[in-house]
């Protein structure tokens, strides 16, 4: 009849174990991507953990508010959503920013699972489109919104470090005339 039928999880303990194994593995993925034993590894691990934990809590609270009951599978997807969202900006954002990135990812994953299921009628039993597509996009955008120079001096054009609105655009001969230099010079008023 065209309606989607939810398939209940067969083993929430195994699903939870799987998410915790992924969560642990993400500590090799995000901090391990620095390819060197540098002090920023601890910061990257902290932002990764913060976003995942807040994503799980945000998804749990959102599902509780919307469905009048907690949904463990949504909380697990919230943790994964936080991990996916923090992957791009993990080295460039503060702990407070990672909190907000995880919070938005946790809420987004619940809303987008419902959107794909109810509105579009797309059969996505584990919420992979929502976790990886929607929250991955959010994480990429959040890099531009929350990156701070203190974590990587001279490399960011983000809103929280003044952004393109207060930054002098690139002026080296290599960047003159490029779309970025032209756009940022117009945005910055130079």
Give the residues covered by each predicted segment.
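Glycine- and aromatic-enriched membrane alpha-helices
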Residues: 1-169, 181-184, 188-190
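Low-complexity, glycine/proline/serine-enriched flexible coil segments
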Residues: 170-175
């Amino acid at each position: 009849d065209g309606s989607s039928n939810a398939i209940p999880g067969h083993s929430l303990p195994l699903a939870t174990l799987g998410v915790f194994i992924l969560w642990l593995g993400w500590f090799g993925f995000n901090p391990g991507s620095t390819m060197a034993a540098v002090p920023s590894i601890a910061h990257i691990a902290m932002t990764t953990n913060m976003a995942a934990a807040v994503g799980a809590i945000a998804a749990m609270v959102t599902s509780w508010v919307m469905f009048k009951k907690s949904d463990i599978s949504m909380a697990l997807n919230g943790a994964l959503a936080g991990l996916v969202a923090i992957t791009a900006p993990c080295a460039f954002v503060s702990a407070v920013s990672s909190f907000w990135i995880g919070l938005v990812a946790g809420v987004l994953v619940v809303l987008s699972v419902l959107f794909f299921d109810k509105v579009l009628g797309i059969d996505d039993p584990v919420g992979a489109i929502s976790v990886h597509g929607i929250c991955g996009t959010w994480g990429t955008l959040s890099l531009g919104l929350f990156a701070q120079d203190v974590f990587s001096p001279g490399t960011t054009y983000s809103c929280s470090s003044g952004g393109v609105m207060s930054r002098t655009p690139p002026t080296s001969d290599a960047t003159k005339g490029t779309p970025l230099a032209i756009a940022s010079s117009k945005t910055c008023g130079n």
